[in-house]
Amino acid sequence: LHRVDRRQRQMCIRDRFNNCPIAGANEIIARAGSMRDRLRYVKIPLTAAYTPQDRVPGKWRPCTVETAPDFTATGYFFAELLADVLHVPVGIVDCTWGGTRVEGWTNREILETYPDIDLTEKGIEATTDWLRPMVMYNAMLHPVAGYTVRGFLWYQGESNVNQYKDYAVRLSNMVGLWRSLWKQGDIPFYYVEVAPFAYGSGNGPYLREAQWEARELIPNSGLICTNDLVEPYEATNIHPK
C-alpha cells in the first residue's frame, strides 16, 4: 500500500454488508463525484493463509463517479460524514469478506484457547471458506497491521448467532489483539448491531445482547443500534435498507 494523506484513515472490517458496494445507488454515486479530493479508498483482496503474511496488494483510488460504485456502502457513508464534519481528507481501508466469523479475524495464539476451534489444516479445510478461523487475519489483516489509522469499523455477527454465549469475550479478545498490533493505544472501535432478522434458531436477540455486553469489555468502543431502524416488513431481510 502506498501512502495517502495521514489526517484521517479508518479501517473498515468485515461482513457481507460492509462488503456490499454502493453500485446501483445512482443518486449517491452522482453525489460521490464531489468527494474526489476528500475521500480515498483501498480494497484488500479476498485472501486466506495458514500463517501470517507481511504483504498484500492494494491501490488507493480517489472517489469519483467512475470508482464510487465499488466502494463499500458502510465505509462510504461513514467517510463522507467524517470528511464533512472534520473538513479533512479521509481514507478507507476496506478489509472485508462477507459472511465470516469473528474467529476468522483472530490469530492462532488466541484461537488455541478456544476448545471448539480446530486449527489443523484438515479441520480448517473441512469448513466453508468464509467461515474458517484465522485465515483472514493472516492474509488480509496482518499485512496492514501498523498502517496508521484513526479507528476501526466492524459490521459482523450473523455467522456467530449460534455461538452468542462466547461472542462478547471473543470480540473483545479480537479488538485487544488488533490494538496491540497497531500500538496506538485504545484507538476507537465502532461496531454495528446485527439487524433484527428472523434467524431460524431464534438466537438473534441473544447475539445482540452479547454485542451490547461487549461494550463493557472493550474500552473506547461504540455500538450503533439498528433494532429500531428496521420496518416490520423487513424482518425476513438479513440486510434491510
Where are these regions (language model features)?
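Catalytic-domain carbohydrate-binding cleft regions of carbohydrate-active enzymes
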Residues: D15-D37, L46-P52, V56-G58, C63-K241
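Single conserved hydrophobic/aromatic residue that forms the stacking wall/gate
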Residues: L1-R9, I13
